[in-house]
Amino acid sequence: MKNITIITSTRAEYGLLRPVIQKVAAAQDLQLQLVVTGAHLCARFGNTIQEIEADGLPIAARLPIFEEENPNEPVALTIARTITVFDGYFAAHRPDAVLLLGDRFEIFAVATAAAARHIPIAHISGGDVTLGAADEYYRHCITKMAALHFPSCAESAARLVRMGEAPETVFCVGGLGDENIRTLPKMTRQELCASTGFDLMQPFAIVTSHPETSAAAGDPAAQADALCAAMEAVPGVFWLITGSNADAGGAVCTAKMQAFAAAHPQRAGFINSLGLKRYLSAMQCTALVVGNSSSGVVETPTFGVPTVNIGSRQAGRIICQNVLCCAAAAPAIEAALRRAMTPEFSAVAHAAQSPYNGGDTSGKICRVLAQFDFAKPKTFYDGPVPEFNPKRSISL
């Protein structure tokens, strides 16, 4: 039986990992060690560990890495602390493999700690491109440390091979977000109203704004102000706003959004974290999705919901026909919002086709984890790039 350690640090990542965690926990040939860290353990991010506890999943360890009193701590210091904390954990609890999702700086730090102890890494969602975020180079660094890859679409899978990853280690399984949308039971609109305390029977938009973190990123406060100005200028929709993430500048974005909601109680409401079920239920009912979260470009095509993607944070990702991209300036955002709310664009959005539909994505990941030979040395591949298809069945 293989011992698989799965790390979760944020609400969004846990929502994606949840079916994988559940299937690893239920598998006869895999043993789950679930480690909760990062924003899950912070009050300012909503103590989202409570969602994991409510799901009844066994938590092997809770490892704090953020300074609760210092939301503006330099990322480099958090990375250093995370490496130290997880090096200690891996020294005492060495798994057969560590399963990581995505590209955040704390996940990069966990990968560094695992690689330094020669613990094999399996990586979900490598090969993507996000030119507007520092996640871009964290993601590709994790790729080079990983022994096994689960990209979410054919384009990302091919990119991994071009980066030197051997095709036999690259399994194009589709997107976990797409699987969640198709399989997770949703709340009714009435249940959403009762759960959030807001009148969501009226047309509403989901708004999530994170700071851009690339070297060329603008001032997060100015970007948040631009979004607020655009929302104020566009009538006829209720703005359901969620909190920002743990990136540098995230606290500023959250404060700006909270202030906007407080100043416009009839037109906007703020919830730090909707959680997976409420978020997907809201996305199913929403008139549009607004902001610069990856879910706005990765998950909304499955619903065919109109989306306004602001700024450069998601630059480089596949942009489907339901997504309008605009600059992070109030006039551009306002124009995009108005266009996204037209019947003409709504019809275009509803016809979108997701490139991330892989069927039983979480099941594929679990089957590969159980069968993959993690003892095999990693090589650098210089050969041709095979054709990938997320809907294709998996075989080792």
Residue locations for each model-derived region?
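Short, glycine-rich nucleotide/cofactor-binding loops
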Residues: 5-15, 101-105, 210-221, 288
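Active-site and donor-binding regions of nucleotide-sugar-utilizing enzymes
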Residues: 7-8, 14-25, 65-167
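A nucleotide-sugar donor-handling region in carbohydrate enzymes
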Residues: 8, 41-43, 145-222, 377
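Conserved nucleotide-sugar phosphate-binding/catalytic loop shared by glycosyltransferases and other
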Residues: 30-78, 85
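Donor-nucleotide binding loops and adjacent catalytic segments primarily
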Residues: 52, 186-285
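A donor-sugar binding/catalytic signature common to diverse glycosyltransferases
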Residues: 100-101, 108, 149, 275-321
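C-terminal amphipathic helix plus adjacent low-complexity
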Residues: 342-396
